């Protein structure tokens, strides 16, 4: 299957550069996955599309302010560090710019010395293993010194860090927000609960590979990055109850979808408490084992994310919906509008 089959024309002006003032002010397109029928709505109306006994599954990961700007201790030369993955204790795999300035043994300082670091290993493609030194709690130091690692297509500065976090974010560890969750407010979650819709949480720490374009010509040749996920015993039991009672399981975002499909795929369609790393790649031809529907944003052309959405609703239906979104000037990508596939 050719990657070009998932291409579409997108005017640059439709790429949302800043979040809306109100989280739930975004628009909502509802796509019937069976017929391809479309309904233009608003996210404030999301509750009306759910029934008592349904279950919504959200990703409670919290984004690390993982961009650090510092200097080399010996020369004062400026460097930028992007935290990718915690290896052990205070050692992290990072991406350094410019990489040539940081060799094994190089010492870096951040925030007037509140945080220092030493390079312990040089990796490929600008990667470096870095060991940090600091007083206090690392994540608190990071919250005060770090900046959000916004996607490359967002050029504007983010005034409020919390607008790149969901209102239910809890488990620190993501390099990017699970953006479908950004539309939810506490009020909408309460309304859903009052209607008898279950709200459950999983954790998947989003890696920067989520922004990596599919470089292969053929879909099947693309290798997905691995991301850490976790599901508790309580959540697994709740989802199995919903399934048994005939309720619909609707995932919020591609991250929740990949977590649920990984777990159900490994346990004959059942949900069970588990944690690990997933590199599941979902594209047309995949048979879903966990979800009945999905809330997601509008994705990049030829991305693994639009392929996942196409696996659920059909490529023709999705591309038709995207053409409609362009005509109606929906906002695209991380800070853009939402789609409900049901």
Curated annotation (Swiss-Prot):
Record bears the keyword S-adenosyl-L-methionine: yes
Please give an example of a GO cellular component term from this record: cytoplasm
Recorded hits in InterPro entries, A to Z, give: QueA, QueA_dom1, QueA_dom2, QueA_sf
In its UniProt record, which GO terms are filed under biological process?
queuosine biosynthetic process; tRNA wobble guanine modification
Q: Which catalysed reactions does the entry list for this protein?
A: 7-aminomethyl-7-carbaguanosine(34) in tRNA + S-adenosyl-L-methionine = epoxyqueuosine(34) in tRNA + adenine + L-methionine + 2 H(+)
Main localization of the protein described in the UniProt heading = cytoplasm
**Keywords on record:** Cytoplasm, Queuosine biosynthesis, S-adenosyl-L-methionine, Transferase
An example Pfam family from this entry, by short name, is Queuosine_synth
Which pathway or pathways does this protein act in? tRNA modification; tRNA-queuosine biosynthesis
Q: Where is this protein found? A: Cytoplasm
Signal peptide range in chain numbering: none
The Enzyme Commission number assigned here is 2.4.99.17
Q: Which domain of life is it from?
A: Bacteria
The record's comment on protein family reads: Belongs to the QueA family.
**What PANTHER family does the record point to?**
S-ADENOSYLMETHIONINE:TRNA RIBOSYLTRANSFERASE-ISOMERASE
What job does this protein perform?
Answer: Transfers and isomerizes the ribose moiety from AdoMet to the 7-aminomethyl group of 7-deazaguanine (preQ1-tRNA) to give epoxyqueuosine (oQ-tRNA).
Under the subunit heading, UniProt states:
Monomer.
Q: Which HAMAP family match?
A: QueA
Q: What is this protein called?
A: S-adenosylmethionine:tRNA ribosyltransferase-isomerase
Organism (species): Bacillus velezensis (strain DSM 23117 / BGSC 10A6 / LMG 26770 / FZB42) (Bacillus amyloliquefaciens subsp. plantarum)
């Amino acid at each position: 299957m050719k990657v070009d089959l998932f291409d579409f024309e997108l005017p640059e002006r439709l790429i949302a550069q800043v979040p809306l003032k109100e989280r739930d002010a975004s628009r909502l397109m509802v796509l019937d996955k069976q017929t391809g029928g479309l309904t233009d709505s608003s996210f404030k109306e999301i509750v009306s599309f759910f029934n008592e006994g349904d279950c919504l599954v959200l990703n409670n990961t919290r984004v690390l302010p993982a961009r650090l700007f510092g200097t080399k201790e010996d020369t004062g030369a400026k460097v930028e560090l992007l935290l990718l993955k915690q290896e052990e204790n205070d050692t992290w795999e990072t991406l350094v710019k410019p990489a040539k300035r940081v060799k094994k043994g190089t010492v870096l300082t951040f925030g007037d010395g509140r945080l220092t670091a030493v390079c312990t290993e040089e990796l490929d493609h600008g990667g470096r293993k870095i060991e940090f030194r600091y007083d206090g709690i690392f994540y608190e130091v990071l919250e005060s010194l770090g900046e959000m690692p916004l996607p490359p297509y967002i050029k504007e500065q983010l005034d409020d860090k919390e607008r790149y976090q969901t209102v239910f974010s809890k488990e620190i560890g993501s390099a990017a927000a699970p953006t479908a969750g950004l539309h939810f407010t506490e009020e909408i979650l309460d309304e859903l609960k009052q209607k008898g819709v279950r709200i459950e949480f999983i954790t998947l720490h989003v890696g920067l590979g989520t922004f990596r374009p599919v470089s292969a010509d053929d879909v099947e040749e693309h290798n997905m990055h691995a991301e850490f996920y976790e599901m508790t015993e309580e959540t697994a039991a709740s989802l199995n109850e919903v399934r048994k009672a005939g309720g619909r399981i609707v995932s919020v975002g591609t991250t929740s979808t990949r977590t649920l499909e990984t777990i159900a795929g490994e346990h004959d369609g059942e949900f069970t408490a588990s944690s690990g790393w997933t590199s599941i790649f979902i594209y047309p031809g995949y048979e879903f084992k966990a979800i009945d529907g999905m809330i997601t944003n509008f994705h990049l052309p030829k991305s693994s994310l639009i392929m996942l959405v196409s696996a659920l609703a059909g490529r023709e239906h999705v591309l038709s919906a995207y053409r409609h979104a362009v005509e109606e000037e929906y906002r695209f990508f991380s800070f853009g509008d939402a789609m409900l596939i049901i």
